[in-house]
């Protein structure tokens, strides 16, 4: 079978399934004659490069039809990043807004928080900087009790938290922000996300996979880093999401 024919058949197969592996498509195409797996792997790679397919895990593909998650950043958030970056240019950090989580929720909860995550050694310094320079109330490592008793999540404020090493990040307008995979794991683990845990978490993860491209390999690698890999796998299996 010519390469164009193989590629056409791959895309046809991809349109009938939400996700698939090399073995899946190899078994399907081999019904009309044996196809070399190396050739098939090469064609899959080319389709990924051409952005006709997405690789959403190790050896797991899907038709390119869902957007990537790109959190929006307000001018205020950009200014906060600039303040921190100018003061500590070598400090690794990540910044985003809680309002970006609302699209994933089933039961909407107000969240006007600006999250500033920095390397563990810099948390205190950045907290002190923002306490002095920002007009917003700034909290360091907030937990459930602090939020429940003292913080109105519907009002703008800043949470300063440690950034987990090797956390998956992306650049939004040259500003480091979390990937969707990072957020889905952090929601499970961080005490300030207590209100999104439990049954709501299932809705969030299900909506994330429905609305956006999610790299399950990246998700599970970070989940392992945070000690919640098995729990994440169990959730994916409960939602009938393919695990690589």
Question: What are the residue ranges of the model-derived segments?
Answer:
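Positively charged, polyanion-binding regions of nucleic-acid-associated proteins
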Residues: 2-16
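Residue-level marker of regulatory loop/turn positions in helix-turn-helix DNA-binding domains and
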Residues: 3, 36, 176
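Short beta-edge/loop segments at beta->alpha junctions of small alpha/beta modules
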Residues: 13-90
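Short, charged/polar micro-motifs that form catalytic or ligand-binding hotspots
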Residues: 15, 116, 170, 174
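Short, well-structured alpha-helical interface segments that form or flank functional binding sites
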Residues: 20, 39-42, 121, 125, ...
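Short gly/ser-rich loop at a beta-strand->alpha-helix junction or flexible surface loop bordering the NTP-binding
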Residues: 59, 75-154
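Hydrophobic alpha-helical interaction segments
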Residues: 135-244
